[in-house]
A protein has these predicted regions:
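Short amphipathic alpha-helix that is part of the acyltransferase structural core
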Residues: 1-28, 119-155
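Acyl-donor-binding surface of acyltransferase catalytic domains
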Residues: 29, 38-42, 46-138, 254-255
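A short helix-loop-beta-strand connector motif used in the catalytic cores of GNAT acetyltransferases and
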Residues: 34-50, 159-169, 190
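Conserved acetyl-CoA-binding loop-helix of GNAT-fold acetyltransferases
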Residues: 73-79, 196, 202-219, 237-242
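Conserved active-site alpha-helix within GNAT-family acetyltransferase domains
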Residues: 95-107, 207, 231-249
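A conserved beta-strand-loop-helix scaffold within acyl/acetyltransferase catalytic domains
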Residues: 156-198
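Conserved hydrophobic beta-strand within the GNAT/NAT acetyltransferase core sheet
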Residues: 192-194, 225-229
Length: 257
């Protein structure tokens, strides 16, 4: 049997073949979301019978690559060694330990994701009344210019995010002080990007704002919200836990520069 030594782009109409390879786990949500949405950036060894997959997504710092498959496939080592420019790498357990071998120049950090436990999902999360919260429309894009661009990184612009995605805002005294949007989605999870302005955080309202926004998204969607942060971001971790997102998932991330 011929084994390809390279990874090639695959047409979206063949993406269903990839579903068994890309698990619906918290760390892999951005990758599975690409496949479910039929977006470009997917490479495989064999379009007819894929066994390894690389999914490339744009991020503000460069690109993020998610890898799935077996470590002994020759195409993976060649693909990873050929990567250039700022890149973050994440991989399934069978591959992750091989990345430092293939790319000894990679730096290592830890990422952590939080969601509801699979049992008793709503037991500790009481949805607050939606006071001061509303779903944003495409015409609201002009109000987001002061917010960080990573909120809509997966869409390219705030206008695109509001046209194609879901975002809610929290208002205090008619001022937009917090936003939460769905960065990517799978059958089970909604990965949430959320931000509260500095003054509102200093005044102690970050928890209340994020709680109301998560409640609005969950009421509409019914999926498991997923918050991801650096493992060193103690404030984000404390916020996630205070919101009853107590199921923790750790993932090693490799950075190439």
């Amino acid at each position: 049997m011929h084994v390809s030594a390279a990874l090639h782009p695959i047409a979206p109409d063949a993406y269903p073949l990839l579903h068994p390879l890309i698990s619906d786990e918290p760390w892999a949500v951005p990758a599975r979301a690409v496949v479910l949405a039929g977006l470009p950036g997917v490479r495989v060894d064999d379009a007819r019978a894929p066994s390894v997959v690389a999914i490339e997504t744009a991020i503000p710092e460069g690109q993020s690559v998610f890898l799935f498959g077996a470590a002994d496939h020759p195409a993976l080592a060649a693909y990873i060694r050929a990567l250039t420019g700022p890149t973050t790498l994440q991989a399934n357990a069978a591959l992750a330990d091989h990345i430092p071998i293939w790319r000894p120049d990679a730096s290592v950090r830890q990422s952590v994701s939080f969601t509801f436990p699979l049992s008793d999902t709503d037991a500790a999360f009481a949805i607050l009344p939606p006071g001061g919260v509303r779903r944003l429309r495409a015409t609201d894009a002009r109000h987001l210019t002061a917010f960080p661009a990573w909120l809509w990184a997966g869409y390219g612009s705030p206008e695109a995010m509001l046209r194609h995605g879901i975002a809610y805002a929290r208002y205090l005294r008619a001022e937009l002080v917090a936003i939460a949007c769905i960065a990517s989605t799978t059958e089970r999870y909604d990965a949430i990007a959320a931000y509260t302005i500095a003054r509102t955080r200093r005044n102690g309202f970050a928890w209340e704002c994020t709680h109301r926004l998560l409640g609005a998204i969950r009421s509409e969607r019914g999926k498991f919200p997923l918050l991801t942060a650096s493992a060193e971001n103690d404030a984000a971790i404390a916020l996630a836990r205070s919101l009853a997102l107590t199921a923790r998932h750790d993932q090693t991330v490799y950075d190439l520069r």
